[in-house]
Protein backbone atom coordinates (compact mmCIF):
# COMPACT_ATOMS: atom_id res chain seq x y z
CA UNK A 1 0.00 0.00 0.00
CA UNK A 2 1.25 3.43 -0.86
CA UNK A 3 1.81 5.95 1.90
CA UNK A 4 -0.25 8.57 0.10
CA UNK A 5 0.37 12.31 -0.04
CA UNK A 6 0.74 14.26 3.17
CA UNK A 7 -0.51 17.80 3.47
CA UNK A 8 1.08 20.50 5.61
CA UNK A 9 -1.91 20.21 7.97
CA UNK A 10 -0.90 16.67 8.85
CA UNK A 11 -3.73 14.98 7.04
CA UNK A 12 -3.30 12.80 4.01
CA UNK A 13 -5.25 11.52 1.08
CA UNK A 14 -4.74 7.87 0.46
CA UNK A 15 -3.72 6.65 -2.96
CA UNK A 16 -5.61 3.41 -2.44
CA UNK A 17 -8.83 4.73 -0.92
CA UNK A 18 -10.36 7.03 -3.45
CA UNK A 19 -12.45 8.82 -0.83
CA UNK A 20 -12.91 12.47 -1.59
CA UNK A 21 -12.44 13.49 2.03
CA UNK A 22 -9.06 13.84 3.66
CA UNK A 23 -7.80 10.88 5.60
CA UNK A 24 -5.94 11.78 8.77
CA UNK A 25 -2.30 10.71 8.41
CA UNK A 26 -2.54 8.34 11.40
CA UNK A 27 -5.22 6.36 9.53
CA UNK A 28 -3.12 5.51 6.47
CA UNK A 29 -2.80 1.86 7.57
CA UNK A 30 -6.62 1.66 7.42
CA UNK A 31 -7.01 3.59 4.15
CA UNK A 32 -8.03 0.44 2.30
CA UNK A 33 -11.19 0.21 4.44
CA UNK A 34 -12.62 3.64 3.65
CA UNK A 35 -15.89 3.47 1.74
CA UNK A 36 -19.08 1.43 1.73
CA UNK A 37 -19.08 -2.35 1.41
CA UNK A 38 -21.98 -4.70 0.79
CA UNK A 39 -22.30 -8.45 0.63
CA UNK A 40 -23.40 -11.64 2.33
CA UNK A 41 -22.31 -13.58 5.35
CA UNK A 42 -23.02 -16.79 7.20
CA UNK A 43 -23.67 -17.07 10.90
CA UNK A 44 -23.99 -19.84 13.44
CA UNK A 45 -23.06 -20.93 16.92
CA UNK A 46 -23.12 -24.10 18.99
CA UNK A 47 -26.83 -24.95 19.42
CA UNK A 48 -27.95 -22.42 16.80
CA UNK A 49 -29.11 -23.26 13.28
CA UNK A 50 -26.84 -21.69 10.69
CA UNK A 51 -28.15 -18.66 8.78
CA UNK A 52 -27.30 -16.30 5.95
CA UNK A 53 -27.35 -12.55 6.29
CA UNK A 54 -26.81 -9.49 4.12
CA UNK A 55 -24.63 -6.65 5.31
CA UNK A 56 -23.61 -3.11 4.49
CA UNK A 57 -20.64 -1.53 6.26
CA UNK A 58 -19.39 2.04 5.93
CA UNK A 59 -15.99 3.27 7.09
CA UNK A 60 -16.07 7.09 6.91
CA UNK A 61 -13.11 9.47 7.03
CA UNK A 62 -13.63 13.15 7.87
CA UNK A 63 -10.09 14.35 8.47
CA UNK A 64 -10.15 13.53 12.19
CA UNK A 65 -7.99 10.72 13.61
CA UNK A 66 -10.71 8.05 13.73
CA UNK A 67 -12.80 6.38 11.07
CA UNK A 68 -16.54 6.36 11.75
CA UNK A 69 -17.97 2.88 11.37
CA UNK A 70 -21.52 1.61 10.94
CA UNK A 71 -22.77 -1.84 10.01
CA UNK A 72 -26.34 -2.87 9.17
CA UNK A 73 -27.38 -6.47 8.56
CA UNK A 74 -30.53 -8.21 7.39
CA UNK A 75 -31.92 -11.73 7.21
CA UNK A 76 -31.07 -13.42 3.88
CA UNK A 77 -32.52 -16.88 4.41
CA UNK A 78 -35.87 -18.60 4.09
CA UNK A 79 -38.46 -17.16 6.53
CA UNK A 80 -37.73 -18.42 10.06
CA UNK A 81 -38.67 -17.38 13.61
CA UNK A 82 -40.72 -14.44 12.34
CA UNK A 83 -37.92 -13.18 10.06
CA UNK A 84 -38.43 -12.64 6.34
CA UNK A 85 -35.68 -12.00 3.79
CA UNK A 86 -34.68 -8.37 4.39
CA UNK A 87 -35.77 -8.28 8.08
CA UNK A 88 -33.26 -6.15 9.99
CA UNK A 89 -30.73 -8.03 12.11
CA UNK A 90 -27.78 -6.74 14.13
CA UNK A 91 -26.47 -3.19 13.81
CA UNK A 92 -23.20 -1.97 15.27
CA UNK A 93 -21.57 1.41 15.28
CA UNK A 94 -18.30 2.87 16.49
CA UNK A 95 -14.86 4.22 15.67
CA UNK A 96 -11.60 2.77 14.40
CA UNK A 97 -8.28 4.50 15.07
CA UNK A 98 -4.56 3.75 14.83
CA UNK A 99 -1.91 4.42 17.43
CA UNK A 100 1.84 3.78 17.18
CA UNK A 101 2.79 0.57 19.01
CA UNK A 102 5.81 0.16 21.27
CA UNK A 103 7.72 -1.58 18.47
CA UNK A 104 6.70 1.10 15.97
CA UNK A 105 4.08 -1.14 14.35
CA UNK A 106 0.59 0.38 14.09
CA UNK A 107 -1.92 -0.67 16.73
CA UNK A 108 -5.60 -0.63 15.79
CA UNK A 109 -8.18 0.34 18.40
CA UNK A 110 -11.85 -0.34 17.68
CA UNK A 111 -14.68 0.92 19.87
CA UNK A 112 -18.11 -0.62 19.13
CA UNK A 113 -21.61 -0.21 20.53
CA UNK A 114 -24.38 -2.78 20.01
CA UNK A 115 -28.09 -2.11 20.52
CA UNK A 116 -28.48 -5.18 22.76
CA UNK A 117 -26.72 -3.86 25.87
CA UNK A 118 -23.11 -4.57 24.90
CA UNK A 119 -20.17 -2.26 24.25
CA UNK A 120 -16.71 -3.49 23.38
CA UNK A 121 -13.19 -2.36 22.63
CA UNK A 122 -10.75 -4.31 20.50
CA UNK A 123 -7.02 -3.73 20.24
CA UNK A 124 -5.10 -5.41 17.47
CA UNK A 125 -2.64 -5.13 14.65
CA UNK A 126 -2.68 -4.20 11.00
CA UNK A 127 -0.28 -5.92 8.66
CA UNK A 128 -0.72 -4.76 5.09
CA UNK A 129 -4.40 -5.37 4.39
CA UNK A 130 -4.94 -7.81 7.28
CA UNK A 131 -6.31 -6.66 10.61
CA UNK A 132 -6.19 -8.97 13.64
CA UNK A 133 -8.41 -7.68 16.45
CA UNK A 134 -7.29 -10.21 19.01
CA UNK A 135 -7.56 -8.33 22.31
CA UNK A 136 -11.08 -7.56 23.43
CA UNK A 137 -12.87 -6.23 26.49
CA UNK A 138 -16.61 -6.27 26.59
CA UNK A 139 -19.08 -4.74 28.99
CA UNK A 140 -22.77 -5.55 29.12
CA UNK A 141 -25.92 -4.65 30.95
CA UNK A 142 -27.46 -7.11 33.39
CA UNK A 143 -30.07 -8.09 30.78
CA UNK A 144 -27.65 -8.50 27.84
CA UNK A 145 -26.66 -11.90 26.48
CA UNK A 146 -23.75 -13.48 28.31
CA UNK A 147 -20.96 -12.71 25.85
CA UNK A 148 -17.54 -12.69 27.53
CA UNK A 149 -15.01 -12.23 24.73
CA UNK A 150 -14.73 -11.89 21.00
CA UNK A 151 -12.01 -11.74 18.35
CA UNK A 152 -12.18 -10.49 14.78
CA UNK A 153 -10.10 -10.84 11.63
CA UNK A 154 -10.56 -8.52 8.63
CA UNK A 155 -8.70 -8.53 5.36
CA UNK A 156 -8.82 -7.89 1.66
CA UNK A 157 -9.23 -11.04 -0.38
CA UNK A 158 -8.25 -11.29 -4.03
CA UNK A 159 -7.09 -7.70 -3.69
CA UNK A 160 -10.53 -6.13 -3.68
CA UNK A 161 -13.17 -7.76 -1.47
CA UNK A 162 -13.36 -7.22 2.28
CA UNK A 163 -13.72 -10.45 4.24
CA UNK A 164 -13.97 -10.93 7.97
CA UNK A 165 -14.51 -13.58 10.61
CA UNK A 166 -15.85 -13.03 14.12
CA UNK A 167 -15.48 -15.61 16.88
CA UNK A 168 -17.03 -15.24 20.31
CA UNK A 169 -17.20 -16.84 23.74
CA UNK A 170 -20.86 -16.67 24.85
CA UNK A 171 -23.43 -18.35 27.09
CA UNK A 172 -20.64 -20.37 28.77
CA UNK A 173 -19.58 -21.91 25.45
CA UNK A 174 -15.98 -21.94 24.19
CA UNK A 175 -14.63 -19.41 21.67
CA UNK A 176 -16.03 -20.35 18.28
CA UNK A 177 -17.19 -18.83 15.02
CA UNK A 178 -20.35 -16.70 15.06
CA UNK A 179 -20.04 -14.82 11.76
CA UNK A 180 -18.07 -14.56 8.55
CA UNK A 181 -18.74 -12.55 5.42
CA UNK A 182 -17.34 -11.32 2.16
CA UNK A 183 -18.27 -7.83 0.99
CA UNK A 184 -17.57 -5.89 -2.19
CA UNK A 185 -16.99 -2.17 -2.39
CA UNK A 186 -20.07 -0.25 -3.52
CA UNK A 187 -18.78 3.30 -3.05
CA UNK A 188 -15.64 5.18 -2.04
C1 LIG B 1 -23.21 -9.21 11.61
C2 LIG B 1 -23.70 -9.04 12.84
C3 LIG B 1 -24.56 -10.08 13.53
C4 LIG B 1 -25.57 -10.83 13.01
C5 LIG B 1 -26.11 -10.82 11.59
C6 LIG B 1 -26.05 -11.67 14.08
C7 LIG B 1 -27.08 -12.56 13.96
C8 LIG B 1 -27.50 -13.43 14.94
C9 LIG B 1 -28.64 -14.32 14.83
C10 LIG B 1 -29.57 -14.41 13.60
C11 LIG B 1 -28.71 -15.02 15.96
C12 LIG B 1 -29.72 -16.14 16.29
C13 LIG B 1 -31.09 -15.63 16.51
C14 LIG B 1 -31.17 -14.72 17.68
O1 LIG B 1 -30.92 -15.21 18.79
O2 LIG B 1 -31.42 -13.53 17.46
C15 LIG B 1 -27.65 -14.56 16.84
C16 LIG B 1 -27.41 -15.03 18.11
C17 LIG B 1 -26.46 -14.50 18.95
N1 LIG B 1 -25.62 -13.44 18.69
FE1 LIG B 1 -25.41 -12.50 16.94
N2 LIG B 1 -25.32 -11.43 15.21
C18 LIG B 1 -24.41 -10.46 14.92
C19 LIG B 1 -23.48 -9.91 15.78
C20 LIG B 1 -23.30 -10.31 17.08
C21 LIG B 1 -22.33 -9.73 17.96
C22 LIG B 1 -21.37 -8.59 17.59
C23 LIG B 1 -22.47 -10.38 19.15
C24 LIG B 1 -21.71 -10.17 20.43
C25 LIG B 1 -21.19 -9.03 20.84
C26 LIG B 1 -23.51 -11.37 19.00
C27 LIG B 1 -23.93 -12.24 19.96
C28 LIG B 1 -24.87 -13.21 19.80
C29 LIG B 1 -25.23 -14.17 20.84
C30 LIG B 1 -24.63 -14.28 22.23
C31 LIG B 1 -26.22 -15.00 20.30
C32 LIG B 1 -26.93 -16.18 20.98
C33 LIG B 1 -26.08 -17.43 20.81
C34 LIG B 1 -26.74 -18.61 21.50
O3 LIG B 1 -27.94 -18.74 21.41
O4 LIG B 1 -26.00 -19.38 22.13
N3 LIG B 1 -23.98 -11.30 17.71
N4 LIG B 1 -26.92 -13.60 16.17
From Swiss-Prot:
Motif segment (GXWXGXG): 35-41
Enzyme Commission numbers on file: 5.99.-.-
Catalytic activity: peroxynitrite = nitrate
Keyword Iron found: yes
Cofactor(s) the protein requires to work: heme b
CDD domains (UniProt xref): lipocalin_heme-bd-THAP4-like
Molecular functions per Gene Ontology: heme binding; metal ion binding; peroxynitrite isomerase activity
Sites where the protein binds heme b: 178
InterPro entries assigned to the protein according to its UniProt record, in alphabetical order: Calycin (IPR012674), Nb(III)_bact/plant (IPR022939), Nitrobindin (IPR045165), THAP4-like_heme-bd (IPR014878)
Enzyme class: isomerase
Keywords, alphabetical: Heme, Iron, Isomerase, Metal-binding
The keyword ATP-binding belongs to this UniProt entry's keyword annotation: no
Cofactor comment text: Binds 1 heme b group per subunit, that coordinates a highly solvent-exposed Fe(III) atom.
Pathway of action: Nitrogen metabolism
Free-text comment about domains: Forms a 10-stranded antiparallel beta-barrel structure able to accommodate a hydrophobic ligand in its interior. In fact, this fold hosts the heme group, which is located in a wide surface cleft.
Subunit and partners: Homodimer.
Family in the record: Belongs to the nitrobindin family.
Known role: Heme-binding protein able to scavenge peroxynitrite and to protect free L-tyrosine against peroxynitrite-mediated nitration, by acting as a peroxynitrite isomerase that converts peroxynitrite to nitrate. Therefore, this protein likely plays a role in peroxynitrite sensing and in the detoxification of reactive nitrogen and oxygen species (RNS and ROS, respectively). Is able to bind nitric oxide (NO) in vitro, but may act as a sensor of peroxynitrite levels in vivo.
The protein's name: Peroxynitrite isomerase
Species in which this protein is naturally found: Frankia casuarinae (strain DSM 45818 / CECT 9043 / HFP020203 / CcI3)
Taxonomic lineage from the root: Bacteria, Bacillati, Actinomycetota, Actinomycetes, Frankiales
Amino acid sequence: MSAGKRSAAGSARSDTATSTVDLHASLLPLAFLVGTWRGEGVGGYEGLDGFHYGQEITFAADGRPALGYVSHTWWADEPRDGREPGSPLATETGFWRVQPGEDGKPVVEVMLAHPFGIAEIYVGTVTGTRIDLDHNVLIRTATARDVTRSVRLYGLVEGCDLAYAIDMEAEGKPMQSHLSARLHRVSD
